Regions:
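Catalytic and substrate-binding regions of extracellular carbohydrate-active enzymes
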Residues: 1-168
Length: 168
């Protein structure tokens, strides 16, 4: 809209996630996990990027533990194990989206030859599932989550969904 920009990013198993490389951003673990960015001016997140906790990216359901992540080169990115990520919009004021989220490494898909740093495990990225729905109704965003399941309850770190991450 003329008043704001809203991005909701998700990737089913039919898509590759956002790549990461050692010379660029090798902490691209969560941008396709329903990352939800709200912007009025375009620079809202610029000042906090150095201290950004990728496990608390806006809209993302993730296990706490940024300090336990090892940076990787991942040319396929991360996506969901499930084939459902959908959205529709009227081009103006209304949109809806839904996602079945259970993270997988893109290099684990069949017939992939560019494995990147697949040997780096980063186990805290995996082991939970969530069903998420989004509805944009004019100036309102309704975000719903259901069935958030911790499949590895013995693993350190709570599962949380972050609404926003700001400098203040």
């Amino acid at each position: 809209t003329p008043d704001y920009h809203l991005m909701i990013n998700m990737a089913s198993v039919r898509c590759d996630g956002l790549e990461s490389a050692a010379f660029a951003d090798n902490y691209n673990f969560n941008p396709t996990d329903v990352m939800t960015l709200f912007q009025r001016h375009g620079n809202e997140y610029f000042q906090i990027m150095e201290g950004w906790d990728v496990t608390a990216s806006p809209g993302v359901t993730a296990r706490e533990g940024m300090e336990r992540l090892t940076p990787v080169t991942n040319w396929r990115g991360y996506c969901s194990r499930h084939n459902f990520a959908a959205g529709a919009a009227d081009g103006a004021d209304y949109a809806a989206g839904g996602y079945i989220f259970e993270k997988m490494h893109g290099a684990d898909k069949e017939n992939v030859n560019d494995k990147g740093d697949r040997k780096v495990k980063n186990e805290l990225l995996y082991g939970f599932k969530a069903y998420k729905g989004y509805f944009v109704l004019g100036d309102y965003l309704v975000a719903l989550g259901a069935g958030v399941t911790n499949n590895c309850p013995d693993m350190e770190g709570h599962i949380r969904t972050t609404l926003d991450q700001t400098a203040r």
